């Protein structure tokens, strides 16, 4: 019976479920009813489970204890007799012994214990004095608020209050700053909205909301119609001048007011008893940009860009700050009103197809901008027949003196007097990049022109064939230090400055001392070439017997990854050497039954060393045979939290990843050593 009771308590408390199993709980109650001894044993088992450092075990144990507390007077007496320890294990009243993880389950345990103790006090407090004293101690000494749903302790409530006060102070400061900013920017917002509304009225001179059919164009009076009207627009007029234009779209006159029937007939209306709503499509409201309205559209786009990038985000942030603060009612209403007006302006701009986008195609440049661009850069056609450099045969005609590379001082003195005379200002012309003298100097090198290479004499056919054969047979090696110092008898050795004194400020003069190194000199004269040998294909096979009765056909050079070292075997797969046969017999005797060949510990260790993956060779049970968890339903406290940092660390610090990094760093060191091996300071270290 005791064994059955222990198993039931362990299964109930280590299941990890939020609710207890009703069937097992019924069996536990039945055993506890049998005798007081079993009830006391159950109490000690539950208190032992409450002492476990796992919040899920404590929560399940408390749920079992709560049900038994409500059914047995003897059990209530046992719990109340050790009530202080019970409070420490369920409520965490001792700050030196806090509730164990997981944190969420510990919070649920505290809430459940608080509600249960309050119910116990209301129901059994009069009969159990120690229970009433414990409730009074929690309420007045430990400051436990039994009305608090979260069942927080005094320290937790103080921390929450301090956090809330700090947030309120931050929100208040931000709200005051937002109120000052809104007062400063209100004028700018109103001005921007007024400017944008004026642009909309200039582009669309009627209001669609008030009178959908009131779009009329002002037409000149009849007396002025015959006169010529000045017009500077290159676009078509908005309203065509035709004989019926005055009657169809002109402003209402006094005759129409006196004759309402004529007004109805002229407009095609049957009567005045109904109204007509004209719906305009969005395509008909799009503003087309031309030369007349380009400046207005550009101003509207600038205002819309300002609203979209600065004013509307500021208004949204004001609304958010005032909403969080909750104490700036008037400012909140003003911010909401400004936000609504800005959003309405953006909506109307989208209806008119005026979008504040950068580099919009189709923008017509203003005339002033075109003039400025033309003033800055003027395209000049290139002069016909222009040559940047004067040819050699035309330089005497241009008055320039031609000096050959072999002419000396005598020839220069023997020149005619007209050419020997030096013109005034010729030195200044040489520095002027636009002068002919400077153009003569800059394309030519400072030294004498190099003579063209002399053509090589053609070789005889026999010599050419021999030379081609020798070139084909000669090895091609990359250029190195040995080729750089090829044929030099004396090499420049490295110099090291030696200073014998180590005083801080009194020093002797530095003396250059030449240190010769035999290894450096040898490296400068010779080259090390690695000879890998000639590839020889593998002719033999593994020929080890496989479980299916066939022989292994792998052609590895030294060692088979499945059967180990390759040894000579006969056609049946038996080793030819007696030592190999004896060794295989010993391995078969030592191999446990039921384990395949690929789980051999020696083979697994070789594979682990090659791949860097743990295959379980160090464990006694092989791969996947590690120690299993005793209670799989509980949360594993030793498991690392599944966070982004943990996942990245698992990938970065994996054994295979570390091995790859080590290999790459070793290769970098080898390349660096090969690159700087011929330098004396690296060679001497």
UniProtKB/Swiss-Prot annotation:
Record field: compositional bias (Basic residues): 622-632
Keywords: Chromosome, Coiled coil, DNA damage, DNA repair, Isopeptide bond, Metal-binding, Phosphoprotein, Ubl conjugation, Zinc, Zinc-finger
Compositionally biased residues, Basic and acidic residues: 380-403, 567-586
Modified residues (Phosphoserine): 253
Binding site for Zn(2+): 542, 552, 560, 563
GO biological process, one term: transcription-coupled nucleotide-excision repair
Coiled coil (residue ranges): 153-198
InterPro entries attached to this UniProt entry: ENTH_VHS (IPR008942), UVSSA (IPR018610), UVSSA_C (IPR049431), UVSSA_N_a-solenoid_rpt (IPR049408)
Subunit structure, as described in the record: Interacts with the elongating form of RNA polymerase II (RNA pol IIo) during transcription stress. Interacts with the TFIIH complex during transcription stress. Interacts with ERCC6. Interacts with ERCC8. Interacts with USP7.
Function: Factor involved in transcription-coupled nucleotide excision repair (TC-NER), a mechanism that rapidly removes RNA polymerase II-blocking lesions from the transcribed strand of active genes. Acts as a key adapter that promotes recruitment of factors involved in TC-NER. Facilitates the ubiquitination of the elongating form of RNA polymerase II (RNA pol IIo) at DNA damage sites, thereby promoting RNA pol IIo backtracking and access by the TC-NER machinery to lesion sites.
Name of protein: UV-stimulated scaffold protein A
Organism this protein belongs to: Bos taurus (Bovine)
Gene: UVSSA
């Amino acid at each position: 019976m005791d064994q059955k009771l222990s198993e039931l308590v362990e299964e109930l408390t280590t299941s990890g479920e939020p609710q207890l199993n009703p069937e097992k709980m019924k069996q536990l109650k039945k055993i506890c009813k049998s005798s007081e001894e079993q009830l006391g044993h159950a109490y000690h088992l539950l208190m032992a489970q409450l002492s476990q450092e796992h919040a899920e075990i404590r929560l399940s144990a408390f749920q079992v204890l709560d049900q038994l507390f409500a059914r047995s007077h003897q059990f209530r007496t046992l719990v109340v007799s050790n009530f202080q320890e019970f409070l420490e294990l369920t409520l965490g009243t001792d700050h030196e012994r806090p509730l164990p993880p997981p944190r969420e389950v510990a919070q649920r345990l505290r809430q459940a214990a608080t509600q249960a103790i309050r119910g116990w006090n209301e129901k059994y407090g009069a009969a159990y004095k120690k229970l009433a004293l414990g409730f009074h101690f929690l309420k007045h000494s430990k400051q436990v608020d039994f009305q608090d749903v979260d069942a927080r302790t005094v320290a937790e409530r103080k921390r929450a209050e301090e956090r809330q006060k700090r947030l309120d102070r931050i929100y208040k400061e931000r709200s005051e700053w937002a109120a000052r900013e809104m007062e400063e920017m209100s004028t700018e917002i109103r001005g921007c909205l007024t400017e944008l509304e004026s642009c909309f009225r200039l582009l669309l001179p009627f209001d669609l909301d008030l009178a959908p059919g009131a779009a009329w164009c002002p037409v000149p009076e009849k007396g002025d119609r015959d006169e010529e009207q000045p017009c500077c627009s290159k676009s078509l007029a908005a309203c065509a001048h035709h004989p019926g234009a005055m009657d169809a779209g002109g402003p209402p006159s006094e005759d129409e007011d006196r004759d309402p029937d004529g007004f109805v007939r002229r407009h095609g209306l049957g009567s005045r008893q109904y109204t007509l709503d004209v719906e305009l499509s969005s395509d008909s409201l799009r503003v087309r940009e031309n030369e007349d309205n380009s400046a207005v559209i550009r101003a509207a786009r600038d205002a819309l860009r300002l609203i979209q990038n600065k004013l509307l985000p500021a208004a949204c942030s004001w609304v958010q700050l005032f909403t969080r603060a909750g104490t700036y009612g008037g400012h909140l209403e003003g911010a909401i009103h400004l936000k609504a007006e800005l959003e309405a302006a953006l909506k109307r701009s989208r209806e008119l197809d005026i979008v504040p986008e950068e580099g919009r195609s189709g923008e017509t440049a203003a005339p002033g901008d075109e003039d400025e661009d033309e003033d800055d850069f003027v395209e000049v056609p290139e002069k016909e027949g222009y040559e940047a450099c004067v040819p050699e045969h035309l330089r005497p005609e241009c008055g320039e003196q031609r000096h050959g590379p072999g002419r000396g001082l005598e020839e220069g003195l023997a020149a005619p007097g007209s050419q020997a005379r030096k013109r005034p200002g010729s030195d200044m012309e040489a520095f002027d990049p636009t002068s002919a003298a400077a153009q003569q100097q800059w394309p030519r090198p400072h030294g004498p022109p190099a003579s063209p290479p002399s053509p090589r004499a053609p070789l005889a056919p026999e010599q050419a064939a021999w030379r081609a054969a020798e070139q084909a047979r000669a090895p091609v090696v990359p250029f190195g230090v040995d080729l750089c110092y090829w044929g030099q008898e004396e090499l420049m050795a490295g110099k090291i400055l030696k200073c014998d004194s180590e005083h801080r400020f009194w020093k002797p003069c530095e003396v250059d001392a030449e240190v010769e190194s035999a290894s450096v000199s040898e490296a400068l004269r010779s080259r090390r070439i690695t000879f890998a040998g000639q590839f020889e294909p593998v002719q033999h096979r593994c020929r080890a017997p496989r479980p299916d009765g066939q022989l292994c056909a792998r052609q590895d050079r030294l060692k088979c990854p499945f059967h180990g070292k390759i040894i000579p075997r006969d056609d049946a797969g038996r080793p030819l050497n007696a030592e190999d046969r004896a060794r295989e017999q010993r391995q078969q005797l030592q191999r446990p039954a039921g384990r395949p060949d690929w789980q051999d510990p020696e083979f697994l260790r070789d594979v682990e060393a090659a791949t860097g993956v743990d295959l379980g060779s160090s464990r006694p049970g092989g791969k996947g045979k590690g120690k299993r968890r005793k209670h799989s339903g509980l949360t594993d406290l030793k498991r690392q939290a599944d966070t982004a940092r943990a996942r990245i660390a698992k990938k970065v610090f994996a054994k295979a990843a570390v091995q790859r990094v080590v290999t790459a760093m070793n290769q970098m060191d080898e390349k660096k050593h090969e690159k700087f091996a011929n330098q004396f300071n690296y060679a001497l270290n």
